[in-house]
Amino acid sequence: MEKQTVAVLGPGSWGTALSQVLNDNGHEVRIWGNLPEQINEINTHHTNKHYFKDVVLDENIIAYTDLAETLKDVDAILFVVPTKVTRLVAQQVAQTLDHKVIIMHASKGLEPDSHKRLSTILEEEIPEHLRSDIVVVSGPSHAEETIVRDLTLITAASKDLQTAQYVQELFSNHYFRLYTNTDVIGVETAGALKNIIAVGAGALHGLGFGDNAKAAIIARGLAEITRLGVALGASPLTYSGLSGVGDLIVTGTSIHSRNWRAGDALGRGESLADIEANMGMVIEGISTTRAAYELAQELGVYMPITQAIYQVIYHGTNIKDAIYDIMNNEFKAENEWS
């Protein structure tokens, strides 16, 4: 692939890691953010110490606060901003962009009030004459591992296969490999909903439960994620792939996962306010829990784990009581769909 110019919107942990992947592949990378101190640190010291204390970035990676300068003559734009501001940033891009580009996003969540997927938001806010079909970049990936060039395999999903293949080639190298998929709904819902299950898995650890319980929540969590995804139009096969069970395993079992760590702290009795203050990073699983719960209620989809976590987070239900309620639900067959 010829050298491409890519704007990465969002200098968080994952945006920074993906910027390095693109730079390693010989592309021009421009990171955009709205914190002058952070942007200056990236350009002056080639570090982003809030996320990576010991990592030095290539000096070819340039950061900007000016969106127009960032987007000038770019070939592709990668959104890696928190879910709650995706629409706002997309509106700013639509007002600034003056040519057609490939639009990608690598964030995982649902818009809190509308319950919409992020690709839908980007489609709504960025006119068709300025963009390709949206490409979702998602899968089992800790930024802490990708930034040190550990092996990572994820998915590029788009309704248009050729556009997904462009992104596959854009990112893939000897340590970072992408597979294509045309099931955007499946890949996107898997990436968003696994954060909820990761909060639950972390809570079980914080409460002192063993591996049996942790395996159960991942397996049963995958079942309810699949039920909701299929109700929205996804293929059930997607959830057995990298963006489904793969991402759920890596997020639901690792201390690298901020959603798992948040759940672990909840299980140990910390308040949600203290957890969010101490974490210093967005915990997408918290807001996604409400969106998924309300969406499941609207569609009549059975999601007992999501419901339990929703009750704990938003109504102050005791975690042990929530677990007791799940364990005393009506008996069901394992493959029952409701």
Swiss-Prot record:
Entry's Gene Ontology BP terms: carbohydrate metabolic process; glycerol-3-phosphate biosynthetic process; glycerol-3-phosphate catabolic process; glycerophospholipid metabolic process; phospholipid biosynthetic process
Catalytic reactions of this protein: sn-glycerol 3-phosphate + NAD(+) = dihydroxyacetone phosphate + NADH + H(+); sn-glycerol 3-phosphate + NADP(+) = dihydroxyacetone phosphate + NADPH + H(+)
EC number(s) from the headed UniProt entry: 1.1.1.94
Binding residue positions for sn-glycerol 3-phosphate: 108, 139, 141, 194, 247, 257-259
Alphabetical list of InterPro entries matching this protein: 6-PGluconate_DH-like_C_sf (IPR008927), 6PGD_dom2 (IPR013328), G3P_DH_NAD-dep (IPR006168), G3P_DH_NAD-dep_C (IPR006109), G3P_DH_NAD-dep_N (IPR011128), NAD(P)-bd_dom_sf (IPR036291)
Gene Ontology CC: cytosol
Localization (cell): Cytoplasm
Superkingdom field: Bacteria
Pathway named in the protein's UniProt entry: Membrane lipid metabolism; glycerophospholipid metabolism
Chief localization: cytoplasm
Assigned keywords, A-Z: Cytoplasm, Lipid biosynthesis, Lipid metabolism, NAD, NADP, Nucleotide-binding, Oxidoreductase, Phospholipid biosynthesis, Phospholipid metabolism
Binding site for NADPH: 13-14, 108, 143, 258, 282, 284
Active site, per annotation: 194
A GO term, aspect molecular function: NAD binding
Pfam families: NAD_Gly3P_dh_C, NAD_Gly3P_dh_N
Role, per record: Catalyzes the reduction of the glycolytic intermediate dihydroxyacetone phosphate (DHAP) to sn-glycerol 3-phosphate (G3P), the key precursor for phospholipid synthesis.
Record family assignment: Belongs to the NAD-dependent glycerol-3-phosphate dehydrogenase family.
Entry-linked PANTHER family: GLYCEROL-3-PHOSPHATE DEHYDROGENASE (PTHR11728), GLYCEROL-3-PHOSPHATE DEHYDROGENASE [NAD(+)] 2, CHLOROPLASTIC (PTHR11728:SF1)
Name recorded for this polypeptide: Glycerol-3-phosphate dehydrogenase [NAD(P)+]
Protein's organism: Streptococcus pneumoniae (strain Hungary19A-6)
Gene: gpsA
